[in-house]
């Protein structure tokens, strides 16, 4: 009990582990495989805080590298506790020993090793605070012989730090640029969500009548129903957002490192405004100006900086071209909404014919875009959604919209396959009263499917998981057919495997659907069973076998 209270005082909201004899003294929620345990708490909190990860030292810890690096680029505050070989045997090459600090040096913002059990509370304080201050994982390495020791220690006082609000001169200069702008545009990133700054962003955007584009895979950083919401930029994002931001003379990049995928050309549009003045706000000064030239850089919390800028805007800020800008925003959004609702298939590249051939051969099956339209008819407004890496999930980038933050979970720029399933498990653990829906292609799902036997247990909360089934590694097939004269190798998956049947064998519901109507109904029913009966459902969506998304470089 005292241990649990200690974690809570420090803001650790959930802790997950993979069972092992190095950590039998600590347990909260156990999974079946290392990557699953590490992905789960990365997204399990809805309120601001820090989640926890731990597993067996050595081979258990090596499974954490990909998920922890994913959390690093997703800017997730996370406590990583790594059991180490016993103090007396370190360096002797004993059972499951390796240099675990070196292993994570590039994947955490801070790391510290404990060599005396009396220092555990002090180090725990420091590591958690570093994770919170830097919005990133931080590592605490503890020799395994300390885990079962009982000692008397004084718990140090928790010392919290305020996040910075930006330099005075920089905030004033940003306010001046936005006050003078004729076509201001705001780009919202993960920092807006992590700092709870959406209300501040709304006030600033409305004061300027500035359209708001969202960073790639951060669709929940601005309310989708807002008249100024333009949708996500980047791969398969919002054409409306791309058309609008290319007209900007001033861009406020709020809470974002301007990752490359958020400025990637799409639909034949190289939209990043080359002559615009760029104001970049990021909690990490090292990332300001890293990918794009900036006019003003501000190190600070997105919410505090937004409030500071708003307070210093001139009385006429946003007035230049306000009426025309509002009209153009509305027209552009309407035109894109109509186009998106009628998009059914992907175009073939010159010299390839996979998509057109698939439409003829599999005329009775859905395309990915048709599936996404059917899905959005059944997703509850308050749902938390996770998406995996890969062709079918990426094609759906423009479809999900949200009215609140911490609702959209995505693999981010590290791009690990197998993220969608364990991340939605973690979301449900942290938010048991909220409907959750995970999405993954059949290739990506196969990487993490061993957690099906974990979530089938009675002590696990219920989820809904949608698996896009086109029996191929679609993104890789897309690239090989393009680069190698319409040829491919190693991209096909077993057509005799049924994930719906495996789900039923694991004690959960398994459903297979072929049409839009079946998909909408199955998803509606699955979410209802999740919330009313605490039942987990896996929906296997049969798709056209070879619809491949547009290329990215």
Residue ranges and their predicted role:
Residues 51-320, 353, 378-381, 460-465, ...:
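N-terminal alpha/beta PP-like core and its mobile active-site loop of ThDP/TPP-dependent enzymes
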Residues 1-12:
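Bacterial Sec-dependent N-terminal signal peptides
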Residues 335-431:
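Active-site diphosphate/adenylate-binding microenvironment
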Residues 155-171, 322-362:
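Long, charged amphipathic helices and adjacent flexible linkers at domain junctions
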Residues 250, 384, 435-437:
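Structural motif
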Residues 28-47:
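N-terminal propeptides/low-complexity segments immediately following signal peptides
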Residues 81, 89-96, 291, 297-299, ...:
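Thiamine diphosphate
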Residues 17-25:
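C-terminal segment of classical bacterial N-terminal signal peptides
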């Amino acid at each position: 009990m005292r241990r649990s209270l200690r974690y809570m005082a420090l803001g650790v909201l959930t802790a997950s582990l993979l069972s092992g004899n190095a950590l039998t003294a600590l347990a909260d929620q156990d999974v079946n495989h290392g990557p699953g345990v590490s992905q789960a708490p990365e997204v399990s909190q809805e309120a601001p805080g820090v989640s926890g990860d731990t597993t067996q030292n050595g081979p258990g810890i090596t499974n954490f590298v990909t998920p922890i690096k994913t959390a690093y680029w997703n800017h997730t505050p996370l406590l990583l506790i790594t059991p180490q070989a016993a103090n007396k045997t370190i360096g002797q090459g004993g059972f499951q020993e390796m240099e675990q600090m070196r292993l994570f040096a590039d994947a955490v913002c801070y790391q510290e090793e404990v060599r005396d059990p009396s220092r555990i509370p002090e180090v725990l304080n420091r590591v958690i605070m570093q994770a919170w201050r830097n919005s990133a994982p931080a590592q605490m390495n503890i020799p395994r012989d300390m885990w079962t020791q009982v000692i008397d220690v004084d718990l140090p006082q928790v010392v919290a730090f305020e996040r910075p609000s930006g330099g005075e001169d920089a905030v004033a200069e940003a306010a001046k640029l936005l006050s003078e702008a004729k076509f201001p545009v705001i780009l919202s990133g993960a920092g807006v969500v992590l700092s709870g700054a959406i209300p501040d962003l709304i006030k600033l955007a409305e004061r300027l009548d500035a359209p708001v584009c969202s960073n790639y895979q951060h669709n929940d950083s601005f309310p989708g129903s807002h008249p100024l919401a333009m949708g996500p930029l980047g791969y398969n994002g919002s054409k409306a957002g791309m058309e609008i931001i290319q007209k900007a003379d001033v861009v406020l990049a709020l809470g974002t490192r301007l990752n490359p995928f958020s400025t990637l050309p799409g639909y034949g549009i190289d939209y990043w405004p080359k002559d615009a003045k760029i104001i970049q706000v990021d909690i990490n000064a090292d990332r300001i100006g890293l990918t794009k030239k900036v006019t003003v850089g501000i190190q600070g919390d997105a919410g505090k900086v937004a409030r500071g800028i708003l307070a210093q805007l001139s009385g006429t800020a946003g007035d230049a071209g306000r009426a025309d800008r509002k009209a153009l925003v509305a027209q552009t959004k309407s035109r894109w909404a109509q186009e998106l609702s009628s998009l059914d298939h992907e175009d073939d590249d010159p010299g390839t014919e996979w998509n057109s051939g698939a439409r003829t051969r599999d005329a009775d099956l859905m395309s990915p875009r048709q599936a996404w339209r059917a899905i959005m008819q059944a997703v509850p407004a308050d749902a938390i959604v996770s998406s995996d890496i890969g062709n079918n999930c990426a094609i759906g980038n423009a479809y999900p919209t949200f009215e609140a933050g911490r609702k959209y979970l995505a693999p981010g720029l590290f791009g690990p396959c197998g993220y969608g399933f364990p991340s939605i498990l973690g979301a449900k653990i942290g938010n048991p009263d909220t409907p959750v829906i995970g999405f993954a292609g059949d290739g990506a799902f196969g990487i993490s499917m061993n957690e099906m036997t974990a979530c089938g247990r009675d002590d696990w909360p219920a989820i809904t998981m949608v698996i896009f089934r086109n029996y191929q590694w679609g993104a890789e097939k897309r690239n090989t057919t393009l680069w190698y004269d319409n040829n491919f190798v190693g991209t096909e998956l077993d057509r005799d495997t049924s994930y719906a049947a495996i789900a039923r064998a694991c004690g959960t519901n398994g459903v297979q659907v072929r049409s839009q109507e079946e998909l909408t109904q199955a998803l509606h029913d699955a979410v209802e069973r999740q919330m009313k009966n605490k039942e987990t459902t896996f929906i296997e969506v049969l798709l056209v076998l070879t619809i491949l998304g547009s290329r990215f470089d």
